[in-house]
UniProtKB/Swiss-Prot annotation:
Keywords: Lysosome, Membrane. Signal peptide: none annotated. It holds the Pfam family BORCS7. Belongs to the BORCS7 family. This is BLOC-1-related complex subunit 7. As part of the BORC complex may play a role in lysosomes movement and localization at the cell periphery. Associated with the cytosolic face of lysosomes, the BORC complex may recruit ARL8B and couple lysosomes to microtubule plus-end-directed kinesin motor.
C-alpha cells in the first residue's frame, strides 16, 4: 500500500492546519462571547443589588414619612383643641368686660 505522494501529504497537512486554525479562532471567539456574557451578568447582578438597596432606603423613607404624618396629625388635633379653648376664653373675657362696664356705669 502506498502512503501517497509528498505533495498530497503536504496538502492534507495544510488542510488540517487550516481547519485547526479555524476551530481555534472559533473557540477563541466563543470564549470572548462567554466572557462578555459573564461580565454582563455580573453587572446585572450588581445593578439588581443596587436597586434592592435603593428600594430598602425608599421604604425606610416612606415609613419615616408616615410616622411624621401621624405625629403632625396629633399636633394638629392638639392645636385645634387649643384654638377652641382660646376662642372660648376670648368670648368669656368679652362677656366679663361687658359685665364690668355695666357695673361701672
Amino acid at each position: 500500500m502506498a502512503t501517497g505522494t509528498p505533495d498530497s501529504q503536504a496538502r492534507f497537512g495544510q488542510s488540517v492546519k487550516g481547519l485547526l486554525t479555524e476551530k481555534v479562532n472559533t473557540c477563541g471567539t466563543d470564549v470572548i462571547a462567554l466572557t462578555k456574557q459573564v461580565l454582563k451578568g455580573s453587572r446585572s447582578s450588581e445593578l439588581l443589588g443596587q436597586a434592592a438597596r435603593n428600594m430598602v432606603l425608599q421604604e425606610d423613607a416612606i415609613l419615616h414619612s408616615e410616622d411624621s404624618l401621624r405625629k403632625m396629625a396629633i399636633i394638629t388635633t392638639h392645636l385645634q383643641y387649643q384654638q377652641e379653648a382660646i376662642q372660648k376664653n376670648v368670648e368669656q373675657s368679652s362677656n366679663l368686660q361687658d359685665q364690668l362696664n355695666h357695673l361701672l356705669k
